[in-house]
Amino acid sequence: MARSAFGWGFSVIAVLMVGSITACNTTTTTEPGQGENASQAPANLTLVSYAVTRDAFEKIIPKFTEEWKSKTGQDVTFEQSYGGSGSQTRAVVDGLEADIVALALSSDVQKIESAGLIQPGWEQEAPNGSIVTNSVIAFVTKASDNIKVEKWADLANPEVKVITANPKTSGGARWNFLGIWGSVTKTGGTEEQAFDFAGKVLANAPVLPKDARESTDVFYKQGQGNVLLNYENEVLLAKQKGENQPYIIPQDFNVSISGPVAVVDTTVDKKGTREVRDAFVQYLFTPEAQQIFAETGFRPVNEEVLAKFASQYPKVENLATIEEFGGWKKAQAEFFDEGGIFDKVITKIGRQ
């Protein structure tokens, strides 16, 4: 697939308008105007992403559309759909016509690939293996609580009520579960010990919300739980919005959470406007876009931008990658498919 060579040099603000498509939506468009190719037909793109990326994309998209308009004269409209990564993946496979997907884990993109909608090799179509953001798992506690939660083992304390999303619908929750499991198996424990520990932690969860954003609402707005397991970026964003609860980044063990992006080939080939879609994906890796990801809580993949935010994103020494779990294809089958480890843990503790 040919990629467009497109230079990016400045940013201006675009106009946001609310639209509707599915899950949680907005529409972003450029204003009509003159450009090098003003007669070029307008393009409409649908971005399908996971819940906690919304704040970042709603800042990035207007900058892209204005720069694209200035460079090419083409008006671009974005429709945006946000929800749990697993739910969003199923929606695309079931017919939601996405041009671009930005999901919580590569296995979700691989499911769309397996459905024949994305061509093999999508990982090589963008920089950094098409991983556009990184994050880690954070523990959020409450200043009013006397319960101490500083490391993974503390989550098994019967007095601790844990808020984490459901791995069946949330990509973030799958990362959380791998964190729970890996905190035992990657630090010298056995799988039997990990199974027992995971059961204790999930037994301490009063609810399993559908996605990371809903987990945040359950914890902050509904007041449930003593500790919230969530993306570091979601915690930092909540802090920016006034929810200033204490949090820690577990240092005894953590997981590097990688967010992939891909073009949905069947959609863009049908519409015949691959150039602008490819350009948008490439734009996500520019310093301008990476700066916005960093400002909205994500660890940028651009090293220069990451260096600027070093104090905000402390290095984690014992940091595992998905490859240490055998890659997402193996991890998905082993942990989260029907009858996998998560289902077995839920069955053991008698939870539906």
Curated annotation (Swiss-Prot):
Compartment(s): Periplasm
CDD domains xrefs: PBP2_CysP (cd01005)
Classification via PROSITE patterns: PROK_SULFATE_BIND_1, PROK_SULFATE_BIND_2
Gene Ontology cellular component annotations, sorted alphabetically: periplasmic space
GO molecular function, one term: sulfur compound binding
Signal peptide region: 1-40
Domain of life: Bacteria
Tagged with keyword Phosphoprotein: no
Any GO BP: sulfate transmembrane transport
Regulation: induction: By sulfur deprivation.
Pfam family, one: SBP_bac_11
Keywords: Periplasm, Signal, Stress response, Sulfate transport, Transport
Keyword Signal: yes
Entry function: This protein specifically binds sulfate and is involved in its transmembrane transport.
Family assignment from sequence similarity: Belongs to the prokaryotic sulfate-binding protein family.
Protein name: Sulfate-binding protein
